[in-house]
């Protein structure tokens, strides 16, 4: 209830400012407002790249970004306090919210480290990661589950020296050499420049997948449309398989457990 009151108050104050500007003869070009929910499993560097195209629309845009858990964001989405939610997993069909998953794209994982670790573990990757110091996302995240499954399939058990809720904090510790760390492949160039790290290896089959979730079957808000179009055509253009492009949008509640990439039964969105 408090968030609803806050949003209405914000709109009232904006209208008040517009009224004052009109009375004083100032231009009143009120920007289009979009409220975006960002699931806390989405790296902030990815979220920024997803949202940025919405700021390049012909008309002015004012964005409000709210980070939170799946439960919080879906509750707000269901009563239209949010225009769209950005998530790293689709909404599960068991969730009693009439919403739709719009696939933005997917990317493999890059394994990075400081030069000392690169020299030690690049040769023979990925089996070289046996007993290597590793920084990991928390075990309840989609990317951690996918990473654990991949390592187990290779019979590789690194030595976990740190677990983090926040991917940016994980990368900060990786930058000081605490351990090998992974990141979405689409961020590799950015992280190499930012942290002066290097690639140890990469795992294109360990996918991080990103979705826009809305109460609409077809996105209508111009900012949400811009986010989806740019993600598919630019950010994830080389990482989105043809099969995913043919089935980008799915109603969440009616999907069966075995249905395609639009939903992951192993990692339902509320648990990610």
PLM features: what roles do these ranges have?
Residues 1-8, 46, 50, 146-147, ...:
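Short amphipathic alpha-helical coupling segments at ligand-binding clamshell hinges
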Residues 27-28, 98-139:
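Flexible hinge/capping segments at coil-to-helix
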Residues 94-107, 121, 168-217:
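Beta-alpha-beta core module
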Residues 69-73, 78-81, 88, 142-198, ...:
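Hydrophobic hinge/microswitch elements
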Residues 31-93, 270:
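Central regulatory/effector-binding core of bacterial HTH transcription factors
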Residues 1-28:
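Alpha-helical "hinge/linker" immediately C-terminal to small N-terminal DNA-binding modules
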Residues 88, 119-123, 131-154, 220-229, ...:
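Secondary-structure junction motif
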Residues 33-37, 85, 135, 181, ...:
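Short, well-ordered beta-strand segments
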